[in-house]
Amino acid sequence: MHIHLFRCQCMIETIHIKNFRGIRELKLENLGQINIIAGKNNASKSSILEALALFLSAKEGFSLFIKILREILLWRGWYGEKSIYDLFYKNSKELEVSVKFLNQDFANLTLKNSNQSFANKNIAVELKSDKNSWSGRFDSHLIHPDYISSILTSAEATQSNFEFITSLTLIKFGYIESIYSQAYETQVLQDAIRLLREAYPEVKSLSPLQKYNKWIIHV
């Protein structure tokens, strides 16, 4: 499992996780552009990435948060209401993921379980950050048969600033082909810029612009 970050405005410096899955409390500091989490089996490596994925999705709104939460619950193995309950460490009522960015921006994601029953949307979720905040609620009806079939047949292009990749992602219909196409397009663009710079060193990039109802490449 891994996470790709796209178009990030600022690098994550610190992540603080409380009461998430098997993690009572964990703080990772001095993070870099590329971070590798290593450890023994059942050492909560996947839980760290899940917590980060939930936080990053929450930064982009409630809808994406629910989408990523569903993917996390499904790839772990959906076993009903208890799958949601098991997000919380040892019967705790609240879990928290806090992140500080290199530019000193700070954001905090909180999930609260109001009681042992998940009926009537008893899980509250809230994001507080320097730039945007929101709150919402959800219940145990997150995973249904139609959703399970749709997630395996969808190969949508990435619309967010990050991508959470699990074994389920890799077996989605058309996913590998989609990633290959994106990589090929990137390589073609890089090759074109390199060739142009041989003749015109001042060239920085290529951008498509529409002019007189026609698309042209602006250098």
Swiss-Prot record:
SUPFAM superfamilies per the record?
P-loop containing nucleoside triphosphate hydrolases
Q: Which residues cross the membrane?
A: none
- The superkingdom listed in its UniProt entry is Archaea
Q: Give the record's keywords alphabetically.
A: Plasmid
Q: Keyword Flavoprotein, does the record have it?
A: no
Q: Where is the signal peptide?
A: none
Question: Is RNA-binding there in the keyword field?
Answer: no
Recorded hits in Pfam families, A to Z, give: AAA_15
Q: Which PANTHER family match?
A: ATP/GTP PHOSPHATASE, ATP_GTP PHOSPHATASE
**Protein name, per record:** Uncharacterized protein MJECL10
Q: Which organism is it from?
A: Methanocaldococcus jannaschii (strain ATCC 43067 / DSM 2661 / JAL-1 / JCM 10045 / NBRC 100440) (Methanococcus jannaschii)
